[in-house]
Amino acid sequence: MGLARALRRLSGALEPGNSRAGDEEEAGAGLCRNGWAPGPVAGSRRRGRFVKKDGHCNVRFVNLGGQGARYLSDLFTTCVDVRWRWMCLLFSCSFLASWLLFGLTFWLIASLHGDLAAPPPPAPCFSQVASFLAAFLFALETQTSIGYGVRSVTEECPAAVAAVVLQCIAGCVLDAFVVGAVMAKMAKPKKRNETLVFSENAVVALRDHRLCLMWRVGNLRRSHLVEAHVRAQLLQPRVTPEGEYIPLDHQDVDVGFDGGTDRIFLVSPITIVHEIDSASPLYELGRAELARADFELVVILEGMVEATAMTTQCRSSYLPGELLWGHRFEPVLFQRGSQYEVDYRHFHRTYEVPGTPVCSAKELDERAEQASHSPKSSFPGSLTAFCYENELALSCCQEEDEEEDTKEGTSAETPERAASPQALTPTLALTLPP
């Protein structure tokens, strides 16, 4: 009975028009050119973050065989990675175990020599050590070099001398391990990430006539991040042409590696730009498709801490709902007199750019190609359009001029000052066609 049922299933699977093959064809037809689905599968819930906004990875390891032995084999890294309370507890227990072990050793040596008898011998191994508590105190005083001057070792027992020498060596090794682990934990560049910030949202807007994905990074400290560079990856489930389902596929997002623009000089906040071209995983996504997409953009900032020369890595992520289509970041860098000023009040702020195309970059390229072959090509922008950055630059310039006029007691404004905006923002109000 069971064999017949299995044969029927096998024959049905070998038929050329079986339903499974049709399902695979339908699934393959719904994929983009890179094998990625344009949106979440119908009926499936949106997946959680793989990398949280604070940079922690939302990953939990289970069913690890021999996890404790593997961690103990790299004890120093384990001590550096654990929390401070567990680290202090571990080191306290280590010192206490060392004192107890050598205290027990000294007590056994004294007991075997007869120092604990009622009438003590005339030449004991340890002076003033007549109990286990006294032996424990002697071990404590020896390892910590307290030196009260009451208890001491004599030359009567070579074993006692050897035990004292061994404890001194073990104490030095333990002290070096503890000091090294504490210093390594204090100097970890992990805390440096607290002063490296990403913008809360990423934006999609036109830059140099191309749709670009942009986000902002900033350094809150005066100390620089040496050899700072950025990279990004797009995480999304993918189905291969062979039907293999990859739950979390990683694809690099180009942020200027070939041109060297991924290397940044992070003195003031910088906007990272990813040009959405034919090699971009976002090439076929418009505003509507982006809202329905199911992916996660992981952004990474790496560099060396100037004070310690240790490499640090700061991470964050953006979901499709955190990608603002048709927005730009407000400027944050201004010039005040002879100095430059960074106003972090505008760091996360964006403003909407009217006229941003809602189609995908692929459709935009196709339209541009058709317009190039057309005898009448209209310029998409308005010649009377004025940039928000220019307005903010001029307003800041006027505020600075008013402050200087108030200090100097003059109400007249010189033409040179009125014509020079003091904000480091794009000052071209018009964008001429190529």
From Swiss-Prot:
Q: Which residues lie within the membrane without crossing it?
A: 132-148
Q: State the Pfam families in the record.
A: IRK (PF01007), IRK_C (PF17655)
Q: Which UniProt keywords apply?
A: Ion channel, Ion transport, Membrane, Potassium, Potassium transport, S-nitrosylation, Transmembrane, Transmembrane helix, Transport, Voltage-gated channel
Q: Where is the composition biased (Basic and acidic residues)?
A: 407-416
Q: Which domain of life is it from?
A: Eukaryota
Its Gene Ontology molecular function terms? inward rectifier potassium channel activity
Q: Give the reaction(s) catalysed.
A: K(+)(in) = K(+)(out)
User: For bias kind Low complexity, which ranges apply?
Assistant: 418-434
Q: How is its activity regulated?
A: Channel activity is regulated by variations of cytosolic pH; channels are activated by alkaline and inhibited by acidic pH values. Inhibited by Ba(2+) and Cs(+) in a voltage-dependent manner; sensitivity to those inhibitors is lower than in other Kir channels.
Record motif Selectivity filter, residues: 145-150
Show the stretches that span the lipid bilayer.
82-108, 158-185
| Ranges per topology, Cytoplasmic | 1-81, 186-434
Family assignment from sequence similarity: Belongs to the inward rectifier-type potassium channel (TC 1.A.2.1) family. KCNJ14 subfamily.
Q: What does this protein do?
A: Inward rectifier potassium channels are characterized by a greater tendency to allow potassium to flow into the cell rather than out of it. Their voltage dependence is regulated by the concentration of extracellular potassium; as external potassium is raised, the voltage range of the channel opening shifts to more positive voltages.
Quote the protein name from its UniProt record. Answer: ATP-sensitive inward rectifier potassium channel 14
